[in-house]
Amino acid sequence: MIVSLIATVLFGYLLGSVSFSYIIAKKIKKIDIRSEGSGNAGATNTLRVLGIGPAICVLLLDVAKGVAPALLAIALTNGDYPLVPALAGLAAILGHNWPIYFGFRGGKGVATSIGVVATLLFLPALCAGIVAILSIVFTKYVSLGSLLFAVLTPIAALIMLPFFHYPLEYIYLAVLLAILSLWRHRTNMGRLIAGTENKLGKKHA
């Protein structure tokens, strides 16, 4: 278990540190995505700066960064030690947010968090995801949808716990990710309250 834990956490962090938005922006426009638009290295800013095609690629790749370490950890431990996939997934998110290859300046970890919790807590993540998507469709605020997903996933998991008996390690992880997401989106929350947050489809002011 210790070897699997170390291996998957290391794998998760190193994979999470691969900033696909940075790499794709450099490849297409030879720019640092962190110096453009909102300055965030993620799919939403990629959409603003590069368009829908590159943004979809970044979104899918960032989600995959969360799925891969969690699945690998489950496979290596036969699902017997839920702490291992939880920490491997967390490591991937920390890698995305603070990537070792790019000066520890990354994104907010939303897509990678989706990959992790969708792997470990599929139904709660699905329910939270539906609410998040609807909020984005009706309000055009991606940050609001991201926050709703982060907060509602652990709530949904707790509601479903008597029926699905999710490992508590997964619940704790979801709560921790919600707190991390709130902190990473603190400036967005300020703009949402002030009514100055950027809407989907509009260029960053």
Swiss-Prot record:
Name the membrane topology term.
Multi-pass membrane protein
**Top-rank EC class of the record's enzyme:** transferase
Indicate where this protein resides in the cell: Cell membrane
Out of the domains of life, which is the source?
Answer: Bacteria
Which residue positions does the secretion signal occupy?
A: none
What Pfam families does UniProt report for this protein, alphabetically? G3P_acyltransf (PF02660)
- Keyword Chloroplast recorded: no
| Residue ranges of the TM segments | 5-25, 56-76, 84-104, 114-134, 144-164, 165-185
* Keyword set, alphabetical order: Cell membrane, Lipid biosynthesis, Lipid metabolism, Membrane, Phospholipid biosynthesis, Phospholipid metabolism, Transferase, Transmembrane, Transmembrane helix
Catalytic activity from the UniProt record: an acyl phosphate + sn-glycerol 3-phosphate = a 1-acyl-sn-glycero-3-phosphate + phosphate
Q: Which GO terms describe its molecular function?
A: acyl-phosphate glycerol-3-phosphate acyltransferase activity
Q: Which cysteines are joined by disulfide bonds?
A: none
Q: Tell me which EC number(s) this protein carries.
A: 2.3.1.275
> What family, per the record?
Belongs to the PlsY family.
Function according to Swiss-Prot or TrEMBL = Catalyzes the transfer of an acyl group from acyl-phosphate (acyl-PO(4)) to glycerol-3-phosphate (G3P) to form lysophosphatidic acid (LPA). This enzyme utilizes acyl-phosphate as fatty acyl donor, but not acyl-CoA or acyl-ACP.
Q: Subunit details for this protein? A: Probably interacts with PlsX.
What protein is this chain from?
A: Glycerol-3-phosphate acyltransferase
Q: Which organism is it from?
A: Shouchella clausii (strain KSM-K16)
